[in-house]
Every structure is written in C-alpha cells, then in structure tokens.
C-alpha cells in the first residue's frame, strides 16, 4: 500500500516538473494535479505581494473498502515544502470523517483509516488539510481540500429488482421472436474493474428460449411452438458479474412465459352425420336440436359460425350459434306436417369468424356435416279453413236467420269428424247459435245496431274421436244499419238577430245528427218547411256539406213588433228509406251596435255570446238564492246565541219555596221542570238565612237581596211564564210537596244547607225536636251525634 501511494507522489512530482505529459488525461481518475497558485503576504520579510507556489505534493488518495486488518489502514502522507523536518510544522485535518473515520499524524502528516469502509454506503470523502507553525499557531499554508476515494471490491451480487417476470409470446412464432428483456443491477462501482459488469445466461428453459448475454433480451429458440401441445414455460435466468468469469457473484430470477393462442386450427365436426327426431307439432321458432364442431383454439379464435347449405329442406330450418357453448342450435323456421313430408336432409357448415391469413396455406378453416331430421306424427286438432271469419247481418234480422258458416278439418291419417260450439267465455252465445255438425251460424235474438254495432266471439272445433284436441277461431260479425231514425238539428236550437240586420246576413250555421250510421256516411239536406215558405222573414241556405246557414230576408227587425221568431227547418237524410224531420229554430231579436255586437236583449241574450242557455241561467240564480238563505240563517243563529247566555254556573241555583206542612206529591214533582231556567247571574247573595233557628211560621219566604231593575231579565221571565201557562204539558212551579213520601231526591238540594253553614261543633240541633213529629228522624240523627262520647264506649 505504501509503495502504491509513493508511486502516486512520484508521478505527481514528474507531472509538476514537466518531465511527464499524460497521454489520455482522465479527470475523474487523476492521481496528481498541478497545485494551485496563491498570493501570500509574508510580514516583516517582503514589502510587496509575491506569488508563491503552494508546496502540496498530493491531491487525491484511495482506500480499500471492507478492510479487515488488525492495524489502521494507511491512506497517504501530507507534506509541505516549508516543512524542513525540524518539527516546527503541525498538520491538521477537517471535513468528512475527520477524527472519526480518518486520523492524521500532526508531525509526519500520515493519514490512516481507523474503521472499515463501504463504497456502496459512501464512495468518497472530502477533507481539508492545513500546515501551521507549532510555536506561533499561524498557518504556513492556506487550507486546501482533497478527496479520499473508497476503492471498490466485488462484494455485491447482481439483483433482478423487477423479478419474477411474466411474459407471453404468440404460438407458432419464428426463431428469434422477442419475448422479454430482463435487467439485473450490481451495486459495485461500474467504473472500476469488472465488479459491476453483468453477463446473462439461461439455466433452465432451453432449447425453447435464448437470452442475449449483454442486453438480457429473451427470444424464442425453436420455431412453431404449439399452444395446444404446451402452453406454459418457466425459464430460469442467471446474471453474473466479473464478466461471467470464475469467482464472480451471481443472482437468478424466474420468467413465466405463456404461449398465446392464434387461429391455427379449423373447426371439425366429431361425426359426419347428425340424426334428429322432431314432432310435427313443434312450434315455429323452437329449438329442435344441437350440433357442435370442435375447435382446439381459445377465445375469439375458437368462435364458430354455423350456416345451412342451400339444399333439400334447408328453407324450413335455421341455425344459430350459442355464444356460451359454441354449439349450433337448429330452430324450426316453418311448421312441419307429417302428412306432407316425413323426413328432411340438409348440410351444415362450421367456420371460424376470425381468420389468420398466415395459415391459409394449411387449408380451408371450415368443416361440413349432414343433418337428417325425421318428422314424428302427432295427433293434431282440427284446422279451420280461415284464421278469421268476418260476417255481416242487418239489424232486426229475424231470429234463426243463417248469416254464415265455419269449416274445420282433421288432417291426420284416418281423419275424425268435427263438432263445433261457441266458446262460453265469449259474449256471442246469447245472440248467436251454431250448428254442431255443419258449422252454420244463425241469429238467436233481434239485433239492434244502435245498441251494439259489432260482435266478436270464438268458435271451438273438437275432434269426435278425441274431444280434448280442440282449435279456436275468432268470429267478427258487423251489424249493418237500417235507416230507421230521422236526422235532427244539432245544438244550438236558439239564436239571435240584430235589429239593424241587413238582408242576406248569415246569423247562424246549423248542422244535423243522425243516430243511424251509414257505412258510406250520411248526406243531409236542409230546407224551410212548406208553411214557412210564404213571405219568410228568414231562409235556409244549404251549403251541401251537411251544414246550412240561417239567412235574413228583411232589412231590419223590431223588438217591439215581434221579439221572437220560430223558423221550422226540414232535414232529410240520404239513406234508404229516406227519413226526415222538422226542427224549429228560435230566433230572438236583440239590440246591437254597428259592428253587430249584442248590447241588450234579455237576461238570456246577454249570455248568448258565452253559450249559456236558459237552464244554465236558472241554475245560477238558484245557487245564488240558496247561498243567500244560508248566510241569513247563519246570522240569525249567531244573534240568537248571544241572547240565550243568561245562565251562569251550575252552582247558581234558586231554591223553591216548599210548604213542609203539605201532604202533597213530594219531590217527583220538582223533577219535572228545568231548575236552570231560574238562574240569574246578576243576582248576588250577600247574606244567607240561618237554618239552625226555629222558623216563625210554617212557611218562611227566603230573604233575597235587592235586584237592580233589568228590562231584559224581566222580559225573559214574562216570556217564559206565558209559554208555560200556554203549555198544558208543562209542570206547575208552585206544586205542593209532601215530605211524607221519600222520593228519589231533589235537584234543588234545599236541605243541604243544614250541614253547610258551620261545622258540627258550632251547631245546636235541639231546635229540630221542637219542629214536630215530621222532623223526629232528623232530630234523632243529629241529636245522637251531638250526645256521642267515645269515652263511654265499652
């Protein structure tokens, strides 16, 4: 190591002295370069600046990576021309790794690496060196920068960063067809030696594929590899550094290669003849069988198209491809009939949809097979001669008239007789009948075209030998019209004419309607009735298009002379027999302005422009009257409700004055009238009469406070009094009450005041004994409560 570094120093000296000139300078690998010049001021020795050549004898050092020696690895030596070997110069080191990775001998300038280095972790270190005077600590040279490069060794194997790989190549490809390019990377220094020079090779996958040693491009090595023989290939690729030489490191990866399909195989039928059996009753469009051609290709290259080759019976059948199974589905295009033809033979061709022109030389990509179809006999229902029967009949045709017939036949071998009947689910059974054997249809009722113009029902035919086999056909019967109704004028029946009308003015256009409906359409004619032809005020102008105009014949009309005119119009139709009717048009004379706008006529004429008739006006007036009556009734009820609020709460009750010495009817009489009628909210009782004293007389009147004069209350009482006096069913308010009869209770609650004025402790009920035998029960009850002493209870 020392020898190599000494060689670097020697070469630098030779280059610096001009003794050697580099043939091919490579800046990135320069071992020594010419030192830079700098201006140094030497104080005390020179009075001017002088350019001094710096005396460094190095520029770049190298150190091996992954050094595992026991001693620190020697890197190189720093030296200055000012160092005379007297020990007065001190060398310092700073920068990347100074003190941690690299150390320097301050006296000799020797640099050592104190730990193992990895180039892949850090390829070089930039440091700064300086020579200073030991005594003065002043720099002898400006600080200078140098580089220590980590020299690479082959310590990293190649790696496939994108592996494993997946690739594909079409089958039947020629030799050298491109498949895939693989790439391996080596972390070693590619600029130094062969440590990063990778060479590719195939360890597994020959002889099908090959690889370029330098580029890693994989290509086919065999021609015409068939996917149907083998589809998947696994190739093992190796990448080795050191140019593939012995001792180089290697890495491997797997490449999975798939042969993609091409259309190199035509479809083939597994057999040449297919036999099918089809019942003759199979419906049109139904699938009657399947055939299949086999294609070993895959995907769209295996898609097959089937076609029927024109020939015997091919026009009765059709074939389509099932996209899921690639089978040919044979369908029935026309109905089969065993009695007509019992067997059919035709050819079917199968071909690929997507052809590859590279393989046309191998032959046509299609195959042909024969299909034989046998028709099976089926017992079929009768067949009608027509799919639909249309018949016509005049209305009012006599019952039992035959209007048509239907025919059905049994086409099977050994045909059976056929019976006919009307389908009970249709509406024609009650109006028509059918002969079960002959199939003739006759009327069963009188038909009225104005009631129903068309009948639609079904006829069923069944075989006598097998009634379950039936067929059905629709019957359409049109009822023809007989001209039995005269035409009538269409609305309006009324119109108006202005007083200032001129002769020849059309004041109204009228049309006609006819309940008869002729298939060719009706033609109506209009004219005046014979009685109106003499000196007519109006005339009828027939427009020959089923309308007519009412035309004035006078120069002005007077409302005072005649307000209404009645114009008879004769309308005649064109059917046979001819029908006509006379219709009367009412014409009202109205006052109009110069433009013909009606100004005044009558209530109805005002609304003529908007199309309101007399009935509509009457309905509007009736609604207005009903609405007014509802409003008046509502107001009256509101006022009556305000007058009736003369009563307050239920507690304001006026007690009746009862004679207790009367042996009368009792409390049942008091229940027959409404006590609420005597309630008065404005009466306020200031004092109540004590009931615990003996009354002065047998009948005491209740003391009532003065009531202010109120006219409303007085009128109310008098009115109620008169009503009850006039009512013989009303109970008398002054009826006698007999308390010897224990009634159902009194709503007046006249005796409740006995226990409502004071508490039991404050009242003395001895006076009840003085009132006589009638109050003995009350005296005993309250007297016992008064004398009750709980201490005497044993």
Curated annotation (Swiss-Prot):
Task: List where in the cell it is found.
Answer: Cell membrane
Entry-listed glycosylation sites: 256, 456, 537, 545
Task: List, alphabetically, the InterPro entries matched.
Answer: Cadherin, Cadherin-like_dom, Cadherin-like_sf, Cadherin_CS, Cadherin_Y-type_LIR, Catenin-bd_sf
Q: Which residues carry this modification: Phosphoserine?
A: 787
The membrane topology term of the UniProt record is: Single-pass type I membrane protein
Q: Which residues cross the membrane?
A: 610-637
The reply to whether Magnesium figures as a keyword in the UniProt entry is no
Q: Name one GO cellular component term.
A: plasma membrane
Q: Name one Pfam family in it.
A: Cadherin
What the entry says about domains is:
Three calcium ions are usually bound at the interface of each cadherin domain and rigidify the connections, imparting a strong curvature to the full-length ectodomain.
What is this protein's function per UniProt?
A: Cadherins are calcium-dependent cell adhesion proteins. They preferentially interact with themselves in a homophilic manner in connecting cells; cadherins may thus contribute to the sorting of heterogeneous cell types.
The name under which this protein is listed is Cadherin-12
């Amino acid at each position: 190591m020392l020898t190599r570094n000494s060689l670097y120093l020697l070469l630098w000296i030779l280059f610096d002295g001009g003794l050697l000139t580099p043939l091919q300078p490579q800046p990135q690998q320069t071992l020594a370069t010419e030192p830079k010049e700098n201006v140094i001021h030497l104080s005390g020795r020179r009075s001017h600046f002088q350019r001094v050549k710096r005396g460094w004898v190095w520029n770049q050092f190298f150190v091996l990576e992954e050094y595992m020696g026991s001693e620190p690895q020697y890197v190189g030596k720093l030296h200055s021309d000012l160092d005379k070997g007297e020990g007065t110069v001190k060398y310092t080191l700073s920068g990347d790794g100074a003190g941690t990775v690299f150390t320097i001998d301050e006296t000799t300038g020797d640099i050592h690496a104190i730990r193992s280095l990895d180039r892949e972790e850090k390829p070089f270190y930039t440091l700064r060196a300086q020579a200073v005077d030991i005594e003065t600590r002043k720099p002898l040279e400006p600080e200078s920068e140098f580089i220590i490069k980590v020299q690479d060794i082959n310590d990293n194997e190649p790696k496939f960063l994108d592996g494993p790989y997946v690739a594909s190549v079409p089958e039947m490809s020629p030799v050298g067809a491109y498949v895939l390019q693989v790439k391996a990377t080596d972390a070693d220094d590619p600029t130094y030696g062969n440590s990063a020079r990778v060479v590719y090779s195939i360890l597994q996958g020959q002889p099908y594929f090959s690889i370029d040693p330098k580029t890693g491009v994989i290509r086919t090595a065999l021609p015409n590899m068939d996917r149907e023989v083998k589809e998947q290939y696994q190739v093992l690729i190796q990448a080795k550094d050191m140019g593939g030489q012995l001792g180089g490191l290697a890495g491997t990866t797997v490449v999975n290669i798939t042969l993609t399909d091409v259309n190199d195989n035509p479809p083939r039928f597994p057999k040449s003849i297919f036999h099918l059996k089809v019942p003759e009753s199979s419906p049109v469009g139904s699938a009657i069988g399947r055939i299949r051609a086999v294609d070993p290709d895959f995907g769209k290259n295996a898609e097959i198209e089937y076609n029927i080759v024109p020939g015997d019976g091919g026009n009765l059948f059709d074939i389509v491809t099932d996209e899921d199974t690639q089978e040919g589905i044979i369908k029935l295009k026309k109905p089969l009939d065993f009695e007509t033809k019992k067997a059919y033979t035709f050819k079917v061709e199968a071909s690929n949809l997507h052809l590859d022109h590279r393989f046309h030389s191998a032959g046509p990509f299609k195959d042909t097979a024969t299909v034989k179809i046998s028709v099976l006999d089926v017992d079929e229902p009768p067949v009608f001669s027509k799919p639909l029967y249309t018949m016509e009949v005049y209305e009012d045709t006599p019952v039992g008239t035959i209007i048509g017939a239907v025919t059905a036949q049994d086409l099977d071998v050994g045909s059976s007789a056929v019976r006919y009947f009307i389908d009970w689910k249709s509406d024609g059974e009650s109006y028509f009948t059918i002969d079960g054997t002959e199939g003739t249809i006759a009327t069963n009722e009188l038909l009225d075209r104005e009631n129903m113009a068309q009948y639609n029902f079904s006829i069923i035919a069944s075989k006598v030998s097998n009634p379950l086999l039936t067929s059905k056909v629709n019957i359409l019967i049109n009822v023809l019209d007989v001209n039995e109704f005269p035409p009538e004028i269409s609305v309006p029946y009324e119109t108006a004419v202005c007083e200032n009308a001129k002769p020849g003015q059309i004041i109204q256009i009228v049309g006609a309607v006819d309940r008869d409906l002729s298939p060719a359409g009706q033609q109506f004619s209009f004219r005046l009735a014979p009685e109106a032809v003499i000196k007519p005020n109006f005339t009828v102008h027939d427009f020959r298009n089923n309308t007519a105009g009412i035309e004035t014949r006078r120069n002005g009309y007077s409302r005072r002379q005649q307000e209404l005119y009645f114009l008879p119009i004769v309308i005649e139709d064109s059917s046979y027999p001819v029908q006509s009717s006379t219709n009367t048009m009412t014409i009202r004379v109205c006052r109009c302005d110069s433009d013909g706008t009606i100004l005044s006529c009558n209530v109805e004429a005002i609304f003529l422009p908007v199309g309101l008739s007399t009935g509509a006006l009457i309905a509007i007036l009736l609604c207005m009257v009903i609405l007014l009556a509802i409003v008046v009734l509502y107001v009256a009820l509101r006022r009556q409700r305000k007058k009736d609020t003369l009563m307050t709460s239920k507690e304001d009750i006026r007690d009746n004055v009862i004679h207790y010495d009367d042996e009368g009817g009792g409390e049942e009489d008091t229940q027959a009238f409404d006590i609420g009628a005597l309630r008065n909210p404005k009466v306020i009782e200031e004092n109540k009469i004590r009931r615990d004293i003996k009354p002065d007389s047998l009948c005491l009147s209740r003391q009532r406070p003065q009531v202010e004069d109120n006219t409303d209350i007085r009128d109310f009482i008098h009115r109620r009094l008169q009503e009850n006096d006039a009512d013989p069913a009303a109970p008398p308010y002054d009826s006698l009450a007999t308390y010897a009869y224990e009634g159902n209770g009194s709503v007046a609650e006249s005796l409740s005041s006995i226990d409502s004025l004071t508490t039991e402790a404050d009242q003395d009920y001895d006076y009840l004994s003085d009132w006589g035998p009638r109050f003995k029960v009350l005296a005993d009850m309250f007297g016992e409560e008064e004398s009750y002493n709980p201490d005497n209870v044993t």
